[in-house]
Amino acid sequence: MNFYEKESVSLYLQELEYIEEIDSGKQHISFLSHPSLGRVLIINGEIQHIEAYQALYHELLLHLPAAFLPRVEKVLILGGGSLFAAYEALKYSTIRTVVLCDYDRAVLDLMGRHYSHAKEVLCDKRFHYVESDGWEFVKQCSERFDLVINDCLSVRNFLL
């Protein structure tokens, strides 16, 4: 059986208005607004988050694998600077710890300025942030987790 791409797939957005733009020293972060898709997060020219698709993506990303576990207490999220995956994880009453490993704290801070869910996550005592490359963190981490979520757009390090 052969699989091939008949047509290239792309998303072209017009009518974007800048809300905030940051050069964090690690990456260029743009936070914009679209009239029908809501807020859009772009990092280094790549779309990372579109508000209109958030529930479809993050609820499945977290709740589907969690449904196969008898009890979820410790969660590791690789990437996830939008904090939506962490927000979904913290909905579980059994959660003791959510560790989010993301490359750039500036993304979390930006989300905290613009989303109430992000403010909640950042203030939750069960939430812990590690500023690191996800692959490097996983290689060095001896801690065990019940659930590991890959909320990274780039998988290049995992392919090496």
Please give the residue ranges for each predicted region.
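The AdoMet/dcAdoMet-binding core of the Class I SAM-like
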Residues: 1-4, 24-26, 52-160
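Short, isolated positions in well-ordered beta-strands
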Residues: 29, 48-49
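N-terminal auxiliary segments of SAM/dcSAM-dependent transferases
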Residues: 1-40
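Short strand-turn-strand beta-turns centered on an Asx-Gly dipeptide
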Residues: 43-45
